[in-house]
Structure formats: C-alpha cells, structure tokens
C-alpha cells in the first residue's frame, strides 16, 4: 500500500537539535519519515548554519535555491548552488553554512531521531 502526502501536511518548525542555539530561528524544516528513510524540506535564511557534527545517517542534500557552503571532514569547503548535490557518508563530521536564503531537500537513512527529540547525552552530536 502506498501513502501520499503534501509538504503542507507537515508543519514547519525549528530543528530540535539546535534548540537554544541562536541560529535555530534561521532554519525551518518540514520532516517526513518512513521506517528506513527521512526526507526534510529545508528553508534557511542567509547566515544560518549547522555547526560541525556527525551522525549515523548517510545524508544527501539537494539545493533547490540559494547557496550553501558545505564542509565534509577535513576537506576544503565547497560551494553548492541550485541543482548541486552534497553526499555526506555515515559518521563523517560536517558543517553547513547558508550563504544565501536557501531552499533544499535532505534525504537521510536511517531516520535521525534527534530531529524529533534532540540528543540528551553530551558530545554525541556536535563536534565544535
């Protein structure tokens, strides 16, 4: 049996794992998850960023509008614009800076439960 939704079915919200950080209000997401993957619609204001972090999930980000600066591991930062795709392997430290107002789609597998409840143990997510 298939399931059909619209993004409007999922209310925009701040990212739970950024709760309490000043950059949280510049990032709004809509999240849809199945048992094995999660898709997130990202709307970010210029200047928003997600600090260096890592997680079990593999991550793919497709930029639809705007520009991001993505850093993977110790590699040089890369500018990613409309149509650009960034693939982040599992447990690889990475960070993202939103250089312009940006719209993007993110796919992760397995789903990241921290997007829903936030991490409760210290040093399990942020690396800076």
Predicted features along the sequence, with ranges:
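A generic "binding-loop/recognition-motif" signal
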Residues: 46, 56-57, 76, 92, ...
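Glycine- and acidic-residue-biased ligand/ion/polar-headgroup-sensing regions
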Residues: 57-68
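Conserved short histidine dyad/triad with adjacent acidic residue
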Residues: 38-54
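Short acidic-glycine-tyrosine-enriched beta hairpin
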Residues: 74-90
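A cytosolic small-molecule/anion-sensing beta-strand core signal
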Residues: 64-65, 81-82, 100
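Ligand-binding loop in jelly-roll beta-barrel domains
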Residues: 90-114
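A short, N-terminal "cap"/entry segment at the start of jelly-roll beta-barrel domains
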Residues: 1-36, 121-128
């Amino acid at each position: 049996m298939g399931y059909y939704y619209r993004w409007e079915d999922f209310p925009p919200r701040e990212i739970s794992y950024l709760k309490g950080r000043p950059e949280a209000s510049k990032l709004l997401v809509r999240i849809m998850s199945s048992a094995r993957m999660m898709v997130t619609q990202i709307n970010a204001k210029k200047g928003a960023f997600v600090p260096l972090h890592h997680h079990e999930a593999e991550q793919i980000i497709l930029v639809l509008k705007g520009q991001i600066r993505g850093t993977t591991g110790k590699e040089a930062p890369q500018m990613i614009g409309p149509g650009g795709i960034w693939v982040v392997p599992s447990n690889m430290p990475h960070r993202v800076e939103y250089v312009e107002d940006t719209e993007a789609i993110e796919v992760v597998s397995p789903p990241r439960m921290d997007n829903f409840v936030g991490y409760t143990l210290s040093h399990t997510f942020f690396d800076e």
